[in-house]
Amino acid sequence: FGHGGLLAISILYFVLFIIVGNFFWKKDKKTPGGLLYVCAVSVIPLLVWAFECLVGIMPKELDTYNDFHIFIRQGWIMMELATISVGCIFLKYRKFPLLTLPICYSGWYLSMDIVPLCLGQAIEPTWGMRNFATVVFALLMLGYALKLDNKKQGTEDYSHWLYIFGATMLWGVIISILAQFELDNEFAYFLTAIINLAYMFISILLKRKIFMVW
């Protein structure tokens, strides 16, 4: 199809997801409608990537969309910012908590892609930089989830999904750090047990079962 074809298909999917999503939403079928809105926001990275490739903005080494989920590159930043922006617009007009999924996911990617730019280095981040960015982003997400939890109004529970994403990212980076240090098995198991106990304590303190999963 080429980049022009992918752009046209992405726009078509985006519009169809919105139209059908609106149909269900207005019929008071919030779940299918909301899921289609999530799909619409999830199309944004591909749409922006195809557009940037078509007009020649995207670097040639980023000419494969699948690399977006594999490699950390500064060239993805516009895709991530666009996804976050569109997701926030949807979230403002359609109160569906799962819309935080593409927003958080893109925010996580952005937190890693932007690190070299903040340091003034247009290079691929090291594992240490990636882990640091993930830890900071996960803690910020958990902190914001706690803030929303304390100010919870209505039936929508946005903090629930933020807790899930934040706890998952934090657990993943902890495992990554332990693997890098190549710690002795018994010591690594001990640290893992301590972290699990901390998660259990937080779960009891916040009355959130999600932390018990880990």
Name each model feature, range by range.
Residues 1-214:
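Alpha-helical multi-pass membrane segments and their bilayer interfacial helix-loop junctions
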